[in-house]
């Protein structure tokens, strides 16, 4: 095994806020005159403790135009998509719930890291879903991510707003579709999405300028592929690499998860224990990104054998990075990490 890990030189000094975030934060403060009133906006943010971007409310308006009776089902027949998560609050579904749900767990799939907030449910068989991805809990999302939880932990980036994400999904569906009977409906929806996004001034690229700027600040991709951003100063303080590559770390995880007995498992855990020691050194020297990376990777691997280590690493990293809400979300998720029971508002 390599030494204590080395700092990774960065071509550009980093700050806590990614490029473009200040501009987006200002945009989030203005009133774009959607049908969603201020009281309802505040309700969403109070229950989730997260600020919602304008495109969230604009997309609700768009879906109301498609299906006034049930905007959440506006994309169901054409795309097999349903608006969930914070959209349940706009539809007042939470008012009918007899229990007090934990919205940190509402539509939180097995592999969703704390940075991910589900907003759209897709194919239930693969547990396909889309959500906002935030680098900071008190900032606006940096992109829309897509995951299929039954297939693994990979997060695919689909633009920086819901219109772009749904359009990209639609265009992919059109390419894969063999039957032609619904093409007219898909074409009509495609044109409607493009027209409304243009009217609102929203970009429709899969990778926007702000997303490319963020990529320059990503210190490591992590297992899920979306990457993590931490502040790195001009002296490269903030992040140091793990002493294992992703491939070798996955082999270590596999050996632990598939060990035939406790003795073999304890032996296989030795490299992880050594890395935890390196993380402690890194934290002492303000390289908080190292523990963040290891914690996210072990969370992504998903084995219950890592839950204790993840609890040891990630809340500490989030606190050191002043991202405490993500630590709260993680704790709630690990206490109730399930492949099922995703809808916290479902009748029990």
Curated annotation (Swiss-Prot):
Disruption phenotype: Morpholino knockdown of the protein causes malformation anbd delayed hatching.
Basic residues bias locations: 1-10
Coiled-coil parts of chain: 170-200
Record's GO cellular component terms: chromatin; nucleus; site of DNA damage
Entry keyword set: Chromosome, Coiled coil, DNA damage, DNA repair, Nucleus
Quaternary organization: Interacts with PARP1 (via the PARP catalytic domain). Interacts with PARP2 (via the PARP catalytic domain). Interacts with core nucleosomes in a parp1- and parp2-dependent manner.
Protein's name according to its UniProt entry: Histone PARylation factor 1
Taxonomic source organism: Danio rerio (Zebrafish)
């Amino acid at each position: 095994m390599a030494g204590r890990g080395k700092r990774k030189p960065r071509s550009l000094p980093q700050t806590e806020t990614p490029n473009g975030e200040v501009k987006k934060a200002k945009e989030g403060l203005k009133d774009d005159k959607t049908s969603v009133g201020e009281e309802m906006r505040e309700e969403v943010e109070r229950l989730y403790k997260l600020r919602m971007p304008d495109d969230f409310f604009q997309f609700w308006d768009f879906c109301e135009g498609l299906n006034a009776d049930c905007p959440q089902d506006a994309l169901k027949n054409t795309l097999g998509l349903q608006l969930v998560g914070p959209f349940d609050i706009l539809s007042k579904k939470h008012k009918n719930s007899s229990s007090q749900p934990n919205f940190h767990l509402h539509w939180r799939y097995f592999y969703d890291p704390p940075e991910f907030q589900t907003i759209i449910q897709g194919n239930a068989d693969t547990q396909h879903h889309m959500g906002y991805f935030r680098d900071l809990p008190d900032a606006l999302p940096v992109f829309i991510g897509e995951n299929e939880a039954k297939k693994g932990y990979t997060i695919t980036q689909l633009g920086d707003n819901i219109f772009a994400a749904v359009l990209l999904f639609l265009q992919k569906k059109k390419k894969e579709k063999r039957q032609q009977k619904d093409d007219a409906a898909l074409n009509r929806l495609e044109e409607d999405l493009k027209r409304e996004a243009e009217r609102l001034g929203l970009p429709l690229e899969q990778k926007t300028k702000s997303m490319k700027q963020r990529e320059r600040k990503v210190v490591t991709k992590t297992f899920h592929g979306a990457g993590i951003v931490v502040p790195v100063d001009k002296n490269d303080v903030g992040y140091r690499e793990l002493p294992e590559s992703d491939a070798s770390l996955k082999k270590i995880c596999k050996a632990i998860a598939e060990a035939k007995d406790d003795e073999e498992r304890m032996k296989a855990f030795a490299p992880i224990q050594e890395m935890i020691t390196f993380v402690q050194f890194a934290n002492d020297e303000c390289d908080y990104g190292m523990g963040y990376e290891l914690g996210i990777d072990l969370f992504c691997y998903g084995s219950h054998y890592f839950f204790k280590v993840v609890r040891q690493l990630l809340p500490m990293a989030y606190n050191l990075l002043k991202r405490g809400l993500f630590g709260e979300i993680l704790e709630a998720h690990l206490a109730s990490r399930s492949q099922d029971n995703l809808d916290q508002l479902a009748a029990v």
